[in-house]
From Swiss-Prot:
Family to which this protein belongs: Belongs to the krueppel C2H2-type zinc-finger protein family.
ZnF (C2H2-type) ranges: 16-38, 44-66, 72-94, 100-122, 128-150, 156-178, 184-206, 212-234, 240-262, 268-290
GO cellular component, one term: nucleus
UniProt-recorded name of the protein: Zinc finger protein OZF
Keywords annotated in UniProt: DNA-binding, Isopeptide bond, Metal-binding, Nucleus, Repeat, Ubl conjugation, Zinc, Zinc-finger
Organism: Bos taurus (Bovine)
Cross-linked sites for Glycyl lysine isopeptide (Lys-Gly) (interchain with G-Cter in SUMO2): 28, 51, 56, 173
Coiled-coil annotated residue ranges, if any: none
Positions bearing the Glycyl lysine isopeptide (Lys-Gly) (interchain with G-Cter in SUMO) cross-link: 157, 169
Chief site of localization: nucleus
Region (Interaction with TERF2IP) residue spans: 212-292
Gene3D superfamilies noted in UniProt: Classic Zinc Finger
Length: 292
């Protein structure tokens, strides 16, 4: 440490102040690094992929992802990491430590980023917007997966029948058709599900739990997707547009029903007289003619 730096520590002198937040620093170089966070300047670019960073130390860490260099090893399982913070996060899996707790429901997480993503289930916030159709998402990874719909990319293929999907989760759902496996069973009624998330949603029927609340009117829902659709009744958002006539809808299912007007598809047929209908509700209403 230089004599000048020691003098500043002793005297309490910190002459370099951030004009944005007022935070003070003893060195101009430290202030300059701090200011990058405000103006989002990212002068340090990765030569491999072009990704930019605000500080040199971050680009050096990032470059390890390209070289495959993994110097830090977990003592429990032997898994290795190129960055210390990734190792520390990983080790919490073994210790069971979950320091980041949601103030709304008490659910705890290993990483702060996971807590932030979870909190959006309570607020309904979806900051990631698709440039093609305007649909919004709570996580960037969800947006990335959704965008494959527009470019027609379907990298996930079923080994059984060859059907391809744009998102891995849809492939996993589809594969249960072939296996018929339903490992997740409800303790209340015995109903079984192929996915854990489906069981969690189902259990709320018994518990009456509705964790997703509308910030506008206070109405609560058991599923985040139901809240998303409901919020559109306040905002007027209609992200699903018909390519034939331009009419827009707040729900994809409503668009699917509407498209049958153009295609003439009528999948619901009366077993009594053979008359066909485009909507299930119309089919049910018609059947009452035969029962009376």
């Amino acid at each position: 440490m230089s004599h000048l730096s020691q003098q500043r520590i002793c005297s309490g002198e910190n002459p370099f102040a951030c004009k944005v937040c007022g935070k003070i620093f003893s060195h101009k170089s430290t202030l300059t690094e701090h200011e990058h966070f405000h103006n989002r300047e990212k002068p340090f670019e990765c030569n491999e992929c072009g990704k930019a960073f605000s500080q040199k130390q971050y680009v050096i860490k990032h470059q390890n992802t390209h070289t495959g260099e993994k110097l830090l090893e977990c003592n429990e399982c032997g898994k290795s990491f190129s960055q210390k913070e990734n190792l520390l996060t990983h080790q919490k899996i073994h210790t069971g430590e979950k320091p980041f707790e949601c103030k709304d429901c008490g659910k705890a997480f290993i990483q702060k980023s996971n807590l932030i993503r979870h909190q959006r289930t309570h607020t309904g916030e979806k900051p990631f917007i698709c440039k093609e159709c305007g649909k919004t998402f709570s996580g960037k990874s969800n947006l990335t997966e959704h965008e494959k719909i527009h470019i027609g990319e379907k990298p996930f293929k079923c080994n059984e029948c060859g059907t391809a999907f744009g998102q891995k989760k849809y492939l996993i759902k589809h594969q249960n058709i072939h296996t018929g496996e339903k490992p997740y069973e409800c303790n209340e009624c015995g109903k079984a599900f192929s996915q854990r998330t489906s069981l969690i949603v189902h259990v709320r029927i018994h518990s009456g739990d509705k964790p997703y609340e509308c910030n506008v009117c206070g109405k609560a829902f058991s599923q985040s997707s139901s809240l998303t659709v409901h919020v559109r009744s306040h905002t007027g958002e209609k992200p699903y547009g018909c390519n034939e006539c331009g009419k827009a809808f707040s729900q994809f299912s409503t668009l699917a029903l509407h498209l049958r007007i153009h295609t003439g598809k009528k999948p619901y047929q009366c077993s009594e007289c053979g008359k066909a209908f485009s909507q299930k509700s119309h089919h049910i209403r018609h059947q009452k003619i035969h029962t009376h």
